[in-house]
Amino acid sequence: MMRIPYRAVVPRATLLHARFSRPPAVPSLTKAFIVSRRTSSHASFIETGHIDVKDDEGLVFVNNIFPSKLQWLLQGPLSGNKTYEEALKRINRPHLAASDPLHIIRRVFPQSLNVDIREVIPRFREGGAFVKYVRKDGVRDNDIVTAVQHHLEHNPIRPWFNPFQQVKVAHVHGRPWIEDLYRIPSQRLRVEFLPGSVDGAATELTTETLYSFFRRYGKLRDIERQPTDSKIAPRYAFVSFTRQKYAVMAKNCMHGFTIPEEEGGGKSGTRIKIKYERKIKFSVIKDWILNHPRIVIPAIAALIAAITVTIFDPIRTFFIEMKIKATLQTEENSVLQWIRNQANKANIIYFGRQRTDPRRLTAIWEDRQGDIKQLQSWLMENAETFIVIHGPRGTGKRELVLDRALENYKYKVVIDCKQIQDAKGDTAKIARAASQVGYRPVFSWMNSMSSFIDLAAQGMIGTKAGFSETLDAQLSKIWQNTATALKRVALSNRKKDDKEAHLSDEEYLEAHPEQRPVVVIDNFLHNATESSVVYDKITEWAAGLTTGNIAHVVFLTTDVSFSKPLSKALPNSVFRTISLGDCSLDVGRKFVLSHLEHGAKDGANSGQNMEEVGDLGTLDSCIEVLGGRVTDLEFMARRIESGETPRAAVNRIIEQSASEILKMFVFDPDIESKQWSHEQAWHLIKTLAHSQDGTLPYNQVLLSDLFKENGETTLRALEQAELIAISSVNGCPDAVKPGKPVYRAVFKRLTENKTLSSRLDLDIVKQLLSSENKSIGKYEQELQVLGSLPKQPRELSARIQWLLQKVASSQNKISQYEHESAILQKVLRREH
């Protein structure tokens, strides 16, 4: 049997040319020998992109012989030295279905068909191949195609890679274009109408004509003609098939076909040019996105926000819940409890039994046992209001709540407002707030980047896109996730089979206030301003926790005006308040002695100090100077333990406090940013030092010439700075006293310094002189206006008399101030 060579042409950049050398199964094809054409002849249609068909030759297209869905393999290792056909042969499965393309093509043509196959040109991307054959005399192309189609109907071929679809064959009417461009087949074809000759004109085919030519290749979905008002040339129409394989067959069989005049092609005929049309053009999408930034940018921002809420919020809530439960889990862990007990036993053996109160505050807690029990009872009640622990700095508010009242409480969250307020910038504030409750992951650094993106978007579309979030929005997210975690913790002990399973979550929390966590907000209103976003969001969130029965909220503050911001959050509620002050003389003595007794048991030289304290009898007088402030008493006790006498320890406290006052209120270079002046602060220090009982009437201070303008605002600012304290009677300010009891001794110590006192008094006199001179200038200006009138009405005489009296009064004050100034200057000269 003769071998008949089959030539497979791969229209790729590598221009591979595979030679099929197996004999066909058709006996008639083995009678002739097809001589292989020269390379130049083969390269001719590769370079031109067209297949030359002679008069005695025909061309058919066979589909479904290559896996078109695996066309991405052509860009991989298969594009090297080994051909696509060889790779297919390696995965040949002849026992399952049709295998390699050569075998499929042999089976396409029946054995009785009198044709010779000349060439096979595969189209890998389209999943088919062109087969060129030679006709015998008297045989027509239609007869050959009909015979092949009839043969495939009775002997269907299903390749291994697509066993659910059969191989189909169609006659090529046009002049197909053999190209290796990156064009993906699709169900939609763009049919362009070109003239059949150089001097002819193309005719736009009707929908009926297009249907008659393309329906034979498969089910049509739609035919869309070019709009009549369109000026795009050449004219075109879109032909959509229901399946991609129909469109592939139609393109390869009809491309380059010239429609004659009798079939609607015009006088010179109309040649059709076909190419694949992608349904979605990425360039169109890109252009639409770039041309509609007002829609796209906010949509992207909303999408990012939705993704963030969906993915990160549950994670953040989980971490917050884990931080709330972390302490309890550690305490309830049996292994950790055993290790802790063994360590305690070892410490007792080697170091003796130690007290559980390292600061020896037992005497203080015994005195405040009523406040502790009151707070614990409030936490067991169902009251939708805030609990406020108020007192000056150093009175032990935090220790009383956390170490005593909540010592055995399961779940508690502590938020330190001072850390948040002292952070510089919104990014730092967000990070501090998140770390307090365990909110993570937090991308606070992205807030600055998002601000730049928002700024660029504002320049493009005129409004902000919403990428960046304000401090208000970020804090709202943090507190909202914290509230969700707190509610989960409060409901963690609830079981489905208990007696109260029929109650809703809200009803259960309302019925069991003991199950709610406790939120402690420390340093509330620290460094607060009129419009503080941090405190507004905290109070708003705390109100939601309280009214929703999610948690108990306890505020710790030194600000006496705490009711104003809290009333905005809960306007119709009465707050439960505990005011902590300085301890009494007896409690202070017990506190100091407990320190000294503990030091004596430790073997320190505090035993000698105990004897000195008893001999000198100065402990009570020293405690009276300190006034019962816990922090000052603790400092004095430690100085005594280190070897100092009580009086020396008190002197050290006075000296340190004096230095702090001078630095903050008298010699502060940044005084312009404060709400008070050096002269106002020194005036209060001087008058309080010279007062008999260490207090001044509130109204008397306001009547001073130094406090004529914004006097109450200045006093409140000095109270916030803890230089003074304002006591109230029935809610009205009544008296001004030093901010700390020891400050009375500090003020006296400062005024005893003649040089410092004279210098600061001289500054006050200068300010008063300047104020009176300005007043006289105003009076004189008004008198000048009145004197310029041509006739002075009788009604102005009273006004003129009043102005003259004011000028005289101010002049008398100026004379007095100048006399005082001269005396102070003499003192300064004498001291130097």
Swiss-Prot record:
GO cellular component, one term: mitochondrial inner membrane
Ranges per topology, Mitochondrial intermembrane: 316-832
Annotated compartments: Mitochondrion inner membrane
Residues annotated as transmembrane: 295-315
GO biological process, one term: mRNA processing
Entry-linked Gene3D superfamilies: 3.30.70.330, P-loop containing nucleotide triphosphate hydrolases
Keywords assigned by UniProt, alphabetized: Coiled coil, Membrane, Mitochondrion, Mitochondrion inner membrane, mRNA processing, RNA-binding, Transit peptide, Transmembrane, Transmembrane helix
The keyword Transmembrane appears for this protein: yes
Membrane topology: Single-pass membrane protein
Transit peptide residues according to the UniProt entry: 1-40
Pfam families the UniProt entry points to: RNA12 (PF10443), RRM_1 (PF00076)
Residues in coiled coil: 766-831
Major subcellular location class: mitochondrion
Domain (RRM): residue spans on this chain: 187-279
GO molecular function per UniProt: RNA binding
Topology Mitochondrial matrix: residue spans: 41-294
Family to which the UniProt record says this protein belongs: Belongs to the YME2 family.
Functional summary from the UniProt entry: Plays a role in maintaining the mitochondrial genome and in controlling the mtDNA escape. Involved in the regulation of mtDNA nucleotide structure and number. May have a dispensable role in early maturation of pre-rRNA.
Protein name: Mitochondrial escape protein 2
Origin species: Aspergillus niger (strain ATCC MYA-4892 / CBS 513.88 / FGSC A1513)
Gene giving rise to this polypeptide: yme2
